[in-house]
Regions:
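"…together with the soluble PPM/PP2C metallo-phosphatase catalytic core" -> "…together
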Residues: 5-256
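Short, Lys/Arg-enriched N-terminal segments with co-localized hydrophobic residues
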Residues: 1-3
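Membrane-proximal soluble regions of multi-pass membrane proteins
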Residues: 54, 247-284
Length: 284
């Protein structure tokens, strides 16, 4: 195991450089194509804002992640850590393409859920089971499937105001990096976090910091929710149960409490009522 070789560092620097350029190009493109813009919720922005920055974000993540993986420049040997790591890439791409279709053509929430369940079922092979000594493995499969889909939607739901999802994701990635250095317990979650941290920081500081010039949209929040679930269950597979829950506890609890209240009041779970706790200071 090595912390970071020079090739890894160079590739990350190039990724940051080209990502900034690509995002500014996409930002300028949105000024010419109205389809790429959206009206801000809660009237936080006077004019329409460039939407679906996830098109650039997700494309850069999968390209540079694949480059590092195929050139053997990641910090650890993935094939020794998880079964069939290529499945992670394939499912990510399908999530991205599905979100892209949904954004511009529309998918019924039920169909969207069916697709998510199907893709996560395929991605279960990227997690090392069993996760515990007291739950039957088949029950673990079912629980991971359910909660992984839930993490995807938690990530998507908190993408409701400037910088919120970016900050939440940064909390996840930075905690994993710091925890890895402190414990010396290197996992694939560390590699993913090293790549996503600079991408997310650039997006937050240059494009998404209030008031945002760009929203990441479903093309970013859905694939990133999938990756967040992978990171969390990778930590759980290493026995880090409390840590895995703690670093994602706020969005999990906010969304869970809000959905329970919404259901009790007779609303569908996916109804856009803007009643999450993180939105209340903004709306007020």
């Amino acid at each position: 195991i090595h912390l970071m070789n020079i090739n890894f560092f160079i590739i990350i620097v190039l990724m940051i450089f080209f990502y900034i350029i690509a995002n500014y190009y996409y930002l300028n493109l949105s000024k010419k194509i109205d389809l790429l813009k959206v009206s801000s919720e809660h009237k936080l922005h006077k004019d329409k804002v460039c939407n679906n920055g996830g098109i650039v974000f997700s494309t850069f993540f999968i390209f540079f992640f694949s480059l590092l993986y195929l050139s053997n420049n990641l910090t650890i040997n993935w094939t020794n850590e998880i079964p069939r790591p290529y499945i992670l890439f394939i499912v990510f791409i399908i999530f991205f393409l599905t979100a892209l279709y949904d954004q511009f053509r529309g998918l019924h929430p039920v169909y969207r859920l069916i697709i998510q369940i199907t893709l996560i079922f395929s991605a279960l092979s990227t997690i090392s089971f069993p996760l515990s000594n007291f739950i039957p493995t088949k029950i673990e499969y079912l629980l991971v499937l359910y909660f992984w889909v839930y993490i995807i939607n938690c990530t998507n739901f908190i993408d409701g105001t400037d910088g919120m999802m970016s900050i939440t994701n940064l909390n996840l990635y930075l905690n994993i990096i710091i925890f890895t250095y402190l414990t010396g317990n290197f996992t694939v979650a560390y590699d993913v976090s090293l790549i996503l941290t600079p991408l997310t920081l650039v997006f937050l500081i240059f494009f998404n910091f209030p008031k945002a010039k760009m929203f990441i949209g479903d093309t970013g929040s859905i694939p990133m929710g999938y990756i967040n679930g992978f990171l969390i269950f990778t930590l759980i597979a290493k026995g880090e149960y409390f840590f895995a829950f703690a670093i994602f506890s706020y969005p999990f609890l906010d969304v869970t409490v809000t959905l329970i209240k919404k259901t009790i009041n007779g609303h569908l779970p996916w109804a856009r009522l803007y009643d999450y706790y993180f939105l209340k200071p903004v709306i007020q």
